[in-house]
Amino acid sequence: MISKYCRLSSPRSDLIIKTHPHAEIIWWGSALKHFSPDDCASLERPVANGRLDIDTPLTLIAENALGLFSSPGLEGHRNGLDASPVFYTVDVEHTENTLRLTSEDSVAGLRLVSELVMTPSGILKVRHALTNLREGDWQINRFAITLPVAERAEEVMAFHGRWTREFQPHRVRLTHDAFVLENRRGRTSHEHFPALIVGTPGFSEQQGEVWAVHLGWSGNHRMRCEAKTDGRRYVQAEALWMPGEKALRKNETLYTPWLYACHSADGLNGMSQQYHRFLRDEIIRFPEQKLRPVHLNTWEGIYFNHNPDYIMQMAERAAALGVERFIIDDGWFKGRNDDRAALGDWYTDEQKYPNGLMPVINHVKSLGMEFGIWVEPEMINPDSDLFRLHPDWILSMPGYSQPTGRYQYVLNLNIPEAFDYIYKRFLWLLGEHPVDYVKWDMNRELVQAGHEGRAAADAQTRQFYRLLDLLRERFPHVEFESCASGGGRIDFEVLKRTHRFWASDNNDALERCTIQRGMSYFFPPEVMGAHIGHRRCHATFRQHSIAFRGLTALFGHMGLELDPVAADAKESDGYRRYALLYKEWRQLIHTGVLWRVDMPDSSIQVQGVVSPDQSQALFMISQLAMPDYTLPGILRFPGLAAEVRYRLRVIDHPEIQLVGEGGHTMRRLPAWMNQPLEASGEWLAKGGIQLPVLDPESAILIALERAV
């Protein structure tokens, strides 16, 4: 007999599912200590007058044929027929942390399998699979995962952005109707990171109850949350398909991307900590699990101006600054003198590198550094030998003129010959050169993405996965970075195949404070590429001190992006200092528990990391703009052990001069900045410390260590 109720549990949350006649989540929230299936009777709904005379369940597939009248989880037809499916549960497989529900519609000839996995970290993984059981193609228009949230979830947090300004949070109230994000750009996108957070009104970093979902998919997507007229609320996530893009022949099966969901009763910090633990436990895999090395990327240092002798000088200076991985960016391959030509011609430029890449690689490695290189396999320039040979290899619709983007087209990886060509060129690059690291870029969105006359954006994304999977299998020691004009392809599915994200093409430290904070809601610091750029940022033309740039890059995977040969002595000393500081603290930053701290003054941003055993912590206070108040207020440290006494010390701070010494912000420093301070974790969490008055666009770094 099929069990009517099933439970999936983690230490922090519980999920209760009614399995039949239809699969429906009836509880998703904080862990239940005294649950009995008999308790579920209390949640049986009344049937309101003036509507249908039956109860309408909000199922995992959200079926309008049951009278839901909401955004359906499945839309499709068989030549106009079988367009209103209703699924009845026929089998349930339940283990401690996994539930597999099989449902069928015998009239429409469809089978739905829903997989739910509750991970130890508290992340709920959900995926659907649809199989066509009958003759005749079943055309799929939409296929979404639907999860209910509590009626008290009245506020939505989502992320918007653009090139050089990713992960910008915004909020809306969810009282009636729906909030929808759609991405049709063919990659995860800068504009709409595929995630939604809904919660109790005013939820914050440290307060409130939230439910979050992230769709692990690197292509087009739709995210939706809705407040129904009956008061129920739900979130929905799906890959978004163009007309005619998906159809199932008899016995064919289509899977949705995995949805990663989370409940937190401890605000946004509790949510992030569960996502971070999940990624560290189940997805992030570094070769040999080594510490994240300090990078130097040549892009903003020399752009396309490649000279092997000069690059070797850059490598020497980089090594002297403490760099551990040296990456040659765009400009190394045949004819690549600017961004208008040569994509697709993946051969060493013999004019720039008459002796090939090996002299540079050998020199880099002789200096004790790893070697990395930039590629953009999915793109092709019209001005390239490859395009002149195969103009039909671009991703496009027949009969239409395809616009260029950044002077390039998208290479159609659905063409076997095009796929094989790219794969073989990278077998050459990685097989004949001791490359340790690949920065994989993708600098153009997809327009009229077609193959053989049919929409093919989804297929292109899957071919990208396939290509990367093959290269990872062939070269397991090579690490890959996901870059798409900065942060245009950041999601859990691509992270399964990569080791680092380039968070943004914007190295401005002030902008990075917001970008990196936004990214930290779902991703831990060790996969967040964060570089110290030039004193004058190439993206914004703002100028920042080396201290502000260095500390901002500290809470990620640190690197430099500049020309170390051209740097003056003061800048070089700063690069060396912050590379050394990063090495000292990276073990903590990349394994500890991340905390973002609520501050009453929005011009002050605070984040920190506490070690798993709570013996040490590192907190950064960034003054983003002029403070709202004369005094910046009190910082109360979360995450510490109440009974432990901690010694507080300042690790780094801007040059502070008091009034009378040439300064202008303070006549007297807080006492703890002049004399050693020891206090209990309880006092530091409840009493806290009075912050100093800082100039805009500066930061201070504080360490807390268990007192002996």
Curated annotation (Swiss-Prot):
It holds the Pfam family Glyco_hydro_36N. It comes from the Bacteria. Its EC number is 3.2.1.22. One of its GO terms (biological process) is carbohydrate catabolic process. Disulfide bonds: none annotated. It catalyses: Hydrolysis of terminal, non-reducing alpha-D-galactose residues in alpha-D-galactosides, including galactose oligosaccharides, galactomannans and galactolipids. The active site is at D441 (nucleophile), D505 (proton donor). InterPro entries: Aldolase_TIM, Alpga-gal_N_sf, Alpha-glycosidase_related, Glyco_hydro_27/36_CS, Glyco_hydro_36, Glyco_hydro_36_N, Glycoside_hydrolase_SF. One of its GO terms (molecular function) is alpha-galactosidase activity. Keywords: Glycosidase, Hydrolase, Plasmid. Homotetramer. Belongs to the glycosyl hydrolase 36 family. This is Alpha-galactosidase. It comes from Escherichia coli. The gene is rafA.
